[in-house]
C-alpha cells in the first residue's frame, strides 16, 4: 500500500495550477445540486470513474463544495505511474494483493476525522460513462463494518459530459445525499437509481422527444 503524504506546498500547486490546467479541457464544470454538508462529520463521496480527469474534478468538489480535506483511494498502478498523487491526498489499493486489507482499514480509519472527504470510485477502475449501470466491487462492506460507530455522511456523485453547441465538453456533476442503510448492495441499488435519474435529466437538456429519453 502506498500511503498519502499531504504536502502543503504541493497541495497549493494542485489547487492554483495543476487542477485548473487539467480541467481546462472542459468548456465548463457545473454542479447541478446543492448538498448539506455537516462540518462535524466526515464525508464519503462515491462517483463514477470514466477518465484520469476525475481525480482533479474530485479535488474541486472537495475544495469548493464540501470544504474538506481530500483523501482518495486510487488503483495502485495509477499511483505508481503518477507518484505525485500521494502528495495530494491519494493512497493506493491493489485488488490482487494482501495489502488491500491495509488500504480498506486506512480508508475506514480516515473517516474518523471530520475534516476529511474520502473519495472512492466504487467500480474499482475506469469504465465508459455510457454504461447503463454502475457496478460496485467488493470493499465498501468492509469499510462500513470497520467504521460502524463513526458518524459520517455518504454522498453520491455522477459526472456526465455533453458537447452540444460547445467546442469542448461541458461536465455536469449531479449530487445526492444517501440516507439509507450502510449496506453495499442496497447502496449500489440506490446509486443506480440516482445514476439513471441523472442520465434522464441530461438527456432532456435540449427538450428532445420524450420517446427517445431513457426510462428509469
Regions found by a protein language model. Give the residues of each.
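Glycine-rich, highly charged phosphate/nucleotide-binding loops
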Residues: 25-31, 99-106
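Catalytic core of membrane glycerolipid acyltransferases/transacylases, capturing the structured
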Residues: 39-97
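Helix-to-loop junction immediately C-terminal to a conserved catalytic motif
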Residues: 12, 17-49
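Alpha-helical membrane-targeting segments
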Residues: 1-26, 80-89
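Soluble or luminal CAZymes and related metallo-dependent hydrolases
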Residues: 10-14, 98-103, 136
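Short amphipathic alpha-helical face segments that pack within enzyme cores
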Residues: 23, 54-57, 139-143
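Non-catalytic C-terminal accessory region of glycerolipid acyltransferases
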Residues: 2-3, 104-216
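Short, flexible loop segments at the rims of nucleotide/cofactor-binding pockets, characterized by
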Residues: 19-26, 94-99, 131-132
